[in-house]
Amino acid sequence: MYNTLISVQQLKDLQTSGKAFMVFDCTGDLMKPEMADTLFATVRIQGAHQAHLDRNLSTHGSSAVNGGRHPLPSREEVATWLGSLGFENQMQAVVYDRNGANYCGRMWWMMKWLGHDAVAVLNGGLQAWEAS
């Protein structure tokens, strides 16, 4: 189980291990939120799910846990979204982005907030993956 960082090689090994895992692309751009969809459609780790800052990692309704520009969704909302993707508690989660671990850090924290320990940030993000 990886619970902080995972290297590119460790993720490649995980992909061929037969173990249950899920990868999340947390790429975002505060100035151009629509770019997250464009970048995700253009290049991503094969099989990755998009974790969009505005749609998945924050909420703007009455269920917000706190205030601010991107308030946290409730635990229930996050769990429902993850469940809709087929994510289960025994799975390893790997999160990455293209922004120097900016939004993937939020996803990592949110999964810990839900009580999920097996979540790790891809060391070096998508840039490291593409360079390998």
Task: Name the predicted role of every residue range.
Residues 1-132:
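Cytosolic catalytic domains that perform sulfur/thiol-centered chemistry
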